[in-house]
Amino acid sequence: MNLKVDIFIPCLVDQYYPDVANNMIKVLERLGCDVQYNVEQTCCGRIAFEDGYWDHCKEVGEKLIMELQHERYIVCPGAACAATVKCQYPALFHNSSLHNQYKSVQKNMFELSDFLVNVMNASDIGARYNSKAVMFDACKAVHELKIKQAPRLLLSKVRELTLIETPSTYSCCGMSGGLDRNNEKLSVDIGSKIIQDFIDAGADTIISTDMDCLMHFDSIIKKNNLPIKVAHLAEVLAAGWN
């Protein structure tokens, strides 16, 4: 297969976790995709939208739409930003001068695991990752994009990986909707409780589709020297290939 795909890299990944983007590209190329990346690509406007600055979100959203209007699949290593385009952009661009372009980008935008499982029909990427891990569901993934089983299917095929489920895998990490900015103590308390639940269950790794959640967990883990680490789904899927 030689499927040409665009990639959309969230700001957080671009600026702080470029290895996540690189690992996603490796996975896509392993499956035969011809990956395209526009170096002028910027932000989807998610934080501005969540904080009520819809005009600012629309301004950067217009730029993103024009950069991605190629009528090919767009793959994003983060459900939160993919959900902004698929679920929030209608409030900004429906019946606007960019209506047709936004509908095209909305239709073609996929979070990584959703794309791999439901478009590429992939499950076993050939990965090997020695760990007892939890798959943490990002709020946007579950509630807006309805993504829950796709990452678990992919992880179930990873050699030497044992998945552990606890009630906390379905909880908010504590930073959603700007809680980390508006109530830091509560945000940290929520994150700390979840991490401890994972440790008590025997997990040594927290895996997620979203670096937003993982960054929040990682800051708590490092500050308190806790015996657990974080890993983006793309990192796990790109690990241990023969």
For each feature predicted by the language model, list its residue ranges.
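Iron-sulfur cluster-binding electron-transfer modules in prokaryotic oxidoreductases
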Residues: 1-242
